[in-house]
Amino acid sequence: MAKEKGRKLIAQNKKARHDYQILDTYEAGLVLSGTEVKSLRQGRASLADGFVQLDGHEAWLHNVHVPEYSQGTWTNHSARRKRKLLLHRVEIDKLESKSQETGHTIVPLALYFKDGRAKVEIALARGKKEYDKRQTLREKQDRREAERTISAIKRKQRA
């Protein structure tokens, strides 16, 4: 099988962008077994409840659901096992120091293949309060409304 070029998205954690304020993002490799890779190539994964935990000088991805490979035998993996993340030592140290602050956590944002290798985009994030979520939604709606009025004015000028 030839190596794929570019980025092929497998799963995205849209709820993380809604529930958290993203402060910093990192790209990390994943240590996977063979059946996990085959299952991911079928595009089956869920990042919904996932989180990253730092243990010593290692980063681990917890609670990410990669279903068992349908053609797998007794060598199949468990669906919600913890998976090791491959990051540089400097990045792990930076994440460890920043995640110790109150209200900060590390969440997965996206799972994808980049040049044939499985990668996960993780983010240092701060939890949003309910009023912050409403404020973000209001700003998004205001931006859309402004774009609509501008496009309507441009349409009238062309006619």
UniProtKB/Swiss-Prot annotation:
GO cellular component, one term: cytosol
Name the record gives this protein: SsrA-binding protein
Record-linked InterPro entries: SmpB, SsrA-bd_prot, SsrA-bd_prot_CS
GO molecular function: RNA binding
Gene Ontology biological-process annotations: trans-translation
Similarity field: Belongs to the SmpB family.
PANTHER family to which the protein is assigned, alphabetical: SSRA-BINDING PROTEIN, TMRNA-BINDING COMPONENT OF TRANS-TRANSLATION TAGGING COMPLEX
Matches recorded under Pfam families: SmpB
Keyword Translocase carried by entry: no
Keywords (A to Z) from UniProt: Cytoplasm, RNA-binding
SUPFAM superfamilies in the cross-refs: Small protein B (SmpB)
Biased composition (Basic and acidic residues): 131-148
Its job: Required for rescue of stalled ribosomes mediated by trans-translation. Binds to transfer-messenger RNA (tmRNA), required for stable association of tmRNA with ribosomes. tmRNA and SmpB together mimic tRNA shape, replacing the anticodon stem-loop with SmpB. tmRNA is encoded by the ssrA gene; the 2 termini fold to resemble tRNA(Ala) and it encodes a 'tag peptide', a short internal open reading frame. During trans-translation Ala-aminoacylated tmRNA acts like a tRNA, entering the A-site of stalled ribosomes, displacing the stalled mRNA.
Positions of the UniProt region annotated as Disordered: 131-159
Gene of this entry: smpB
Major localization class: cytoplasm
Subcellular location: Cytoplasm
